[in-house]
UniProtKB/Swiss-Prot annotation:
One of its GO terms (cellular component) is Golgi apparatus. It is found in: Golgi apparatus, cis-Golgi network. Belongs to the MNN1/MNT family. One of its GO terms (molecular function) is alpha-1,2-mannosyltransferase activity. Keywords: Glycoprotein, Glycosyltransferase, Golgi apparatus, Signal, Transferase. Its EC number is 2.4.1.-. It comes from Saccharomyces cerevisiae (strain ATCC 204508 / S288c). Glycans are attached at N113, N136, N259, N264. Present with 11400 molecules/cell in log phase SD medium. Pathway: Protein modification; protein glycosylation. Glycosylated. GO terms for biological process: mannan biosynthetic process; protein glycosylation; protein mannosylation. The gene is MNN5. This is Alpha-1,2-mannosyltransferase MNN5.
């Protein structure tokens, strides 16, 4: 009898275990076996059917509940404080501004009182606690949120759908076959012809906010402008994404981007902007990140060379008293050369490569910074400098959460032309191949390590260019790394605006070439753009032109015909100068 009871209990335990496993599998029947490598095997709190609704509701609730009090003080008043010598828009190559970018200077130029800082720190901490609490989704739950595998994401709507159209054609022209999702913001829904008839032919589709996010959370946030980008990255169906602004054109095949060492090592690839960082110490205090004031670890983007190579207070430390060294680090070393800070340069978010599973929380915290960007974080992180907006919120979020990322070390190149003497028109940022950059960075590390004695000597002539960018971060033959993206953010490929603003026309009415570096990206990019715009909107019968909402009231007007004449004239000019532009001999 006792043996039978024991057998019955054992059988009950086995049956219960089987039922439990079947329940777990039923909830996750569309999730890969990647749950096996999760740190903890947790039964899901949310069933698959309501996972997304609960996620977005919980996320928005956490953002709303942790709204910072009041709003940021006026920057002009902060910058007018005694002892503030704020240097606006310090470029990568600018020298003589180390003291302006120092811990002491940036502290004085963005000096929040302790009560305000503590209030900001409290709500920031509560939100990050939610990331490790209610929003601490397991690997399988994260994967269930995003049904797609990997692809390219951009933001459309309005004129940005027109820009995305040309950008996508350039992607396919380079041989990139990855699927594409165009995120359509709530106020721009209705791009039916573009979304339903044209985009599927190019292995793409539109994603509408209203199809993904419940209406109440969406209305609670009232997203605009930069905020739409980060939320768009979250609602995309892909687990791994290459994000491109709609005016950013890939000139290399991107199909293998997710198989690169740099991406697998970090899960987040970023590119540099033109400007030095001016994020104040107050931000680091708010996010709970410690700055080691006595430890310098880099010279702008050079974190390979020993500090003794460029800082005499380190190479000849015995020549200075502890007080002199402390004053040096506080007053004369750029804050973002110190240990515990985000590295220079500031970031440019027109292109990013992101593992959304690995950097799930990074994106959620970046969304928090963007929702409260206009009232607090944009001004705090960038202090009103050029390009203020979402661009530095991604690196800030990764830094706050101590997550890995790689920012391309090679500075971008400009492309543009002189409209008149001393009147340079910058048209595009040329960003470099991230994997080439990463591999060269690793080679440079090995070179410095193998010659550490030589590199440790103080070099009085050291500059970022001659000590790092033009020596360690170039190919073995001395040539520059490849260009991967043309971010044409100044004269956007919107034919209507180009025509009305008389772009690519000189001061005397003559045709001019704007893009002057085809040798760097291996093609006549300007001819591609204008040929495509003319072919898509002018040589095609008007009845067959894609019915973009942006063009609704423009197509059947005399000005449309004038626009087409403008495009044709410029195409003719570009074709006549093509060989010369490409350096070809007749």
């Amino acid at each position: 009898m006792l043996i039978r009871l024991k057998k019955r209990k054992i059988l009950q335990v086995i049956v219960s275990a089987v039922v439990l496993i079947l329940f777990f599998c039923s909830v996750h029947n569309d999730v890969s076996s990647s749950w096996l490598y999760g740190k903890k095997l947790r039964l899901p709190v949310l069933t698959r059917s309501n996972l997304k609704n609960n996620f977005y509701t919980t996320l928005v609730q956490a953002i709303v509940e942790n709204k910072p009090a009041d709003s940021s003080p006026d920057l002009s008043k902060l910058h007018g404080a005694e002892g503030c010598s704020f240097a606006n828009n310090v470029a990568a190559h600018d020298s003589g501004h180390d003291s302006d970018l120092s811990y002491e200077s940036l502290s004085k130029c963005y000096n929040l009182n302790k009560t305000v800082q503590e209030s900001l720190r409290e709500v920031h901490s509560k939100f990050t606690d939610t990331l490790s609490g209610k929003l601490n989704f397991s690997i399988p739950q994260r994967e269930a949120l995003f049904s797609g595998s990997e692809g390219i994401v951009t933001i459309g709507g309005g004129k940005y759908s027109v820009l995305a159209y040309t950008m996508i054609k350039k992607l396919r022209d380079t041989g990139t076959t990855l699927p594409i999702e165009v995120i359509i913001p709530p106020q721009d829904e209705g791009e039916d012809d573009f979304c339903k008839n044209w985009l599927p032919k190019f292995n793409g589709k539109c994603i509408y906010f209203s199809d993904i996010v419940p209406s109440k959370p969406l209305s609670d946030l009232k997203l605009t402008h930069f905020q739409l980008k980060v939320f768009g990255l979250i609602i995309s169906s892909f687990k791994r994404i290459i994000f491109l602004d709609a005016d950013n054109y890939a000139v290399k095949n991107l199909d293998l981007a997710f198989n690169t060492t740099s991406f697998n090592d970090t899960g987040l690839i970023l590119w540099p902007d033109f400007w030095r960082r001016v994020t104040p110490p107050a931000f680091y205090n708010i996010i709970g990140s410690s700055i080691n004031i006595g430890k310098r670890v880099r010279f702008v983007s050079d974190d390979i060379s020993p500090v003794s190579r460029y800082d005499p207070f380190v190479s000849n430390s015995n020549d200075y008293t502890p007080k002199e060294r402390q004053e040096h680090f506080l007053k004369h070393v750029p804050l973002h050369d110190l240990d515990g800070t985000m590295p220079d340069l500031s970031s440019e978010s027109g292109q990013m490569v992101i593992d959304k599973i690995r950097h799930f929380n990074t994106l959620l915290l970046a969304l928090y910074y963007n929702v409260y960007g206009p009232t607090w974080y944009y001004k705090m992180i960038s202090q009103g400098t050029a390009g203020e907006g979402d661009k530095d919120t991604f690196v800030a979020a990764a830094h706050a959460l101590n997550m890995p990322y790689y920012q391309v070390r090679t500075n971008f190149e400009f492309d543009g032309f002189f409209y008149q003497k001393d009147d340079y028109k910058g048209l595009a940022l040329l960003q470099h191949d991230f994997e080439q950059d990463y591999k060269q960075y690793q080679k440079a590390q090995q070179k410095v390590k193998a010659n550490i004695e030589e590199f440790s000597k103080l070099d009085p002539d050291y500059t970022l260019d001659n000590g790092f960018l033009k020596t360690l971060m170039v190919n073995d033959d001395g040539s520059d790394l490849d260009i991967m993206f043309i971010h044409a953010s100044f004269y956007k490929a919107d034919p209507w605006t180009l025509y009305h603003e008389n772009r690519f026309i000189g001061p005397n009415g003559e045709q001019v070439r704007g893009f002057r570096k085809p040798h760097r990206y291996g093609m006549d990019f300007e001819l591609f753009l204008f040929n495509d715009m003319r072919g898509s909107f002018c040589t095609t019968p008007k009845s067959q032109v894609i019915k973009f909402k942006y063009f609704t009231d423009k197509v059947n007007t005399p000005e449309w015909d004038a626009m087409c004449e403008y495009l044709t004239n410029h195409v003719n000019y570009l074709e006549s100068t093509h060989k010369e532009a490409m350096g070809e001999k007749n």
